[in-house]
Amino acid sequence: MSKREKIYSSVISEFIKDKNSSILVIGAQLADKVAFYSAGFTNVLLSGYDERKLAYEPYEWVKENGMSLSFDEKTFDYVVTHNVLHHMSSPHKGLTEMYRVAKKGVLVFESRDSFIMQVAERFELTQKYEVAGCYETSGVDGTNVPNFIFRWTEREIEKTINTFSPAFKHRFVYRYWSIYPDGPDLSSFKKIILNFIRPFYFLFTKLFSKQQNGFAFFIEKPTDNSTLNPWLYFDNNKLRLEVDNNWVRNNYKKNRNKR
């Protein structure tokens, strides 16, 4: 297994303890099959844009658009994707779709929009568009058009989920690592620069771990009303969420405006 596959397998085992959990993988490749199989998971459904016939056994594969999944809410215990959201024309929509069909949690592996990555982009030491590694069906939305590499921050992830599901308090967990770029599309001079700064990069990221270029984020999905935000409660008579006006009066000088 490559370093990336070992990280993948290790992280999914950390966050998904039950090997029999129902899991949907978005944008699945053979690396996904290897990671889950190596970690001992049994109930995994792989999905993707295209209809390539690959050796996915013992798992099943279905064709799905990650930004518009055909499944009902809370169909799977967990939904996972590995370096796929940045291939979508709307990565945020892909993330909220994962959240929608998950019951317990969402696990995503992506590139982090760290300060170092922003500097690397500025000096063209890394790609902004995934041109060098693009082949048929690997571009934006499963086409051969190279995608923009959308890199994430923790704040953006949390804003996206809290906007999509504002009633609940969410738990976000992050894990960081580095896959040092080899610059396949760079000139010889820039490759020399990359090799020169390599030890300084690893020293810097050892001190400041969030500056690494790769991370995984786990979003634990609320499973009951105990995780509601304090200004809300579930009305058992109306069978819906309501605003707790007593909480509002106690925490704000004036009642919120009635509409």
Identify the role of each PLM range.
Residues 61, 170-259:
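A C-terminal cap/extension of S-adenosyl-L-methionine-dependent methyltransferases
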Residues 145-174:
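Short alpha-helix
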Residues 2-20:
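Conserved alpha-helix/loop element of class I SAM-dependent methyltransferases that forms part
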Residues 92-108:
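A short glycine-rich, Lys/Arg-flanked "PGG" loop and its adjoining helix->strand segment in the class I
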Residues 24-68:
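Class I SAM-dependent methyltransferase SAM/SAH-binding core
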Residues 80:
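A conserved beta-strand element that flanks and buttresses the S-adenosyl-L-methionine
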Residues 104-136:
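Conserved class I S-adenosyl-L-methionine
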